[in-house]
Amino acid sequence: MANVTLFKQDGSQNGNVELNDSIWAIEPNENVVFDAIIMQRASLRQGTHAVKNRSAVRGGGRKPWRQKGTGRARQGSIRSPQWRGGGVVFGPTPRSYSYKLPRKVRRLAIKSVLSQKVIDNDLIVVDSFSFDAPKTKEFAEVLNKLDVNTKVLVVLEDGNDFTALSARNLPNVTVVPADGINVLDVVGNQKLILTQAALSKIEEVLA
């Protein structure tokens, strides 16, 4: 099994922690990661775009002139697409862009990006965080002690505690609970910080 250093909140080392090789030591599959990112970005699209077709534009119920005898081209409505102010043909309508990859593919994608963090030495495991109240400044000091000065994803066992409240207002810091870890957030941040409890929870789900 692979080992990584276990840190305390003050930045000091507290031994090593073993990682499950089936999650943290696989060969990263870039194609699957790409597919997972596209899927996740698609699900973030609002899909509220809309235009009015000829049935939705107000007016146009009366034939503008009689069918024959005027010498002009026949017309049935002033809201036909060829008219100024007419409806739009084949325009966008509200829709959902979300779709799902197979469960095994999604799991392979998250395992691939987690393994890549180990390969790049961008994984940091902390035994636990302890804050008596939401203190953004104190969490910033913790990051300095851990020598983290870039975009970082912090994964906690539970996102509803003082640690999450302390970290969420810092620029370049993203906080998610262990059951909310995802490919897009892992790829979008250079460093990955896990608590020991979050690590256990991730391995329990993905193993």
From Swiss-Prot:
Keywords, A to Z, come to: Ribonucleoprotein, Ribosomal protein, RNA-binding, rRNA-binding
One example of the protein's molecular function in GO is: rRNA binding
Answer yes or no on keyword rRNA-binding: yes
In terms of InterPro entries, this protein maps to: Ribosomal_uL4, Ribosomal_uL4-like, Ribosomal_uL4_dom_sf
One Pfam entry for this protein is: Ribosomal_L4
Detail the disulphide connectivity of this chain as listed in its UniProt entry: none
Q: Which GO terms describe its cellular component?
A: ribonucleoprotein complex; ribosome
Q: Which PANTHER family match?
A: 50S RIBOSOMAL PROTEIN L4, LARGE RIBOSOMAL SUBUNIT PROTEIN UL4M
> Its quaternary structure?
Part of the 50S ribosomal subunit.
Query: HAMAP family in the record, alphabetically?
Result: Ribosomal_uL4_B
Protein name (database record): Large ribosomal subunit protein uL4
Q: Which organism is it from?
A: Latilactobacillus sakei subsp. sakei (strain 23K) (Lactobacillus sakei subsp. sakei)
This protein's encoding gene? rplD
